[in-house]
UniProtKB/Swiss-Prot annotation:
It is a peripheral membrane protein. It holds the Pfam family ATG16. This is Autophagy protein 16. GO terms for cellular component: phagophore assembly site membrane. It comes from Aspergillus fumigatus (strain ATCC MYA-4609 / CBS 101355 / FGSC A1100 / Af293). CDD domains: Atg16_CCD (cd22887). Belongs to the ATG16 family. Keywords: Autophagy, Coiled coil, Membrane, Protein transport, Transport. The keyword Acetylation does not apply. Residues 70-153 form a coiled coil. It is found in: Preautophagosomal structure membrane. GO terms for biological process: autophagy; protein transport.
Length: 172
């Protein structure tokens, strides 16, 4: 009954590990989407799209949205984070692929070893049964020989008794 619980728990733990391995990608994706939306707002400020009555701010005043260098720096930071996460995931993939290959080889070796052990066990059992059969046949032949000897001695004794009775009946 506890077997299925163990399998279920193991499956949940494996799922959690997979999801936690991709947290960096999820965070990078969220940041990229935020930057993209911020970049679109910044582009509206720079191009002057929007309401015609909105005045373009003077050169001394800062824009309400982030500046282009800030957006560019944030995008570069996110790109480097995404590349770092990608390289980590690639390294993890390589590591897991290597481990998978090792496990496959080990599984193949274990299967062969199990087959060899089963064959040896079968041969041992066969040898044991043959030995028991030989011992039973020897016992049977010994008992038959003893039985024949007993019958021969009994027949000889009965024959002597019959002759003795015959000899005794001649004089009566």
């Amino acid at each position: 009954m506890a077997h299925w619980r163990n399998e279920y728990s193991a499956a949940l733990a494996a799922r959690d590990r997979r999801e936690k391995a991709n947290v960096a990608l999820y965070n990078a994706s969220d940041r990229t989407s935020r930057i993209a939306s911020t970049g679109a707002q910044g582009a509206q400020y720079l191009t002057g799209t929007g309401d015609k009555h909105t005045a373009i701010p003077a050169a001394g005043k800062s824009l309400a949205g982030p500046s282009v260098p800030d957006i560019l720096a944030a995008t570069r930071a996110d790109l480097s984070e995404a590349q770092r996460a990608r390289s980590e995931l690639q390294a993890r993939l390589t590591e897991l692929s290597t481990e998978l290959e090792k496990l496959r080889k080990r599984s193949t070796q274990d299967s062969r070893r199990i087959h060899v052990l089963e064959s040896e066990d079968f041969q041992d059992e066969l040898a044991s049964l043959n030995l028991q059969l030989n011992m039973a046949e020897e016992r049977s032949s010994r008992l038959q020989r003893e039985n024949r000897e007993l019958i021969d001695r009994w027949m000889a004794r009965i024959g002597r008794e019959a002759e003795a009775m015959n000899d005794a009946s001649k004089f009566s």
